[in-house]
Amino acid sequence: LARALDYFSSEKFHECLVLLQPLNRRYKLNPRYRAYLAVCLYYEWEYAEAIRLFDEVIPQLQGVAPHELSLYYWMDAESYFALQQYDRALPLYEKMLPLCRDNEKPDAYYRLGFCHLFAAESSGASEKASGSSESSGSSAEERKKAKECFELSLEGYLKYRNTPNEKARIAQIRHMIGGLK
């Protein structure tokens, strides 16, 4: 276990995973170590397995530091997002927001914007398929929420992360907001 934790703290997630998985099968590790295992799975792109573990252990980790918990929410949400389960990712990004640092919020709002945008597309398509005569009420609401999230994201990027590396992201967000008017 000590070697696995050394690998984890050195961000050698594959090596940590190789050691933690058999330990967890044999001894049923405590929730924090299983969260570390979920982090390793996330970095190995094993999103379904990471989700299973994060969803199991996050409710048991309410006593950890807020920032640590926010990272677990982020990775859980990102795993759902990667699997295109945006409706499942959305509440996890929302739970992360009050716990994370201010300079991390733009990324969460950016993803939330996409979750709402995909929900708008989904509800618009289902309303069209059902022949609903309503003018996409929930679709319009989701688009409004998406725009609000993208605006909050842009505000955060401009305030905390306005660097040459983020110029393309900032430009993209501006275009997204323009497209949602």
Question: Residue locations for each model-derived region?
Answer:
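Structural signature of alpha-solenoid helical repeat junctions
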Residues: L29, E68, E104, E142-K145, ...
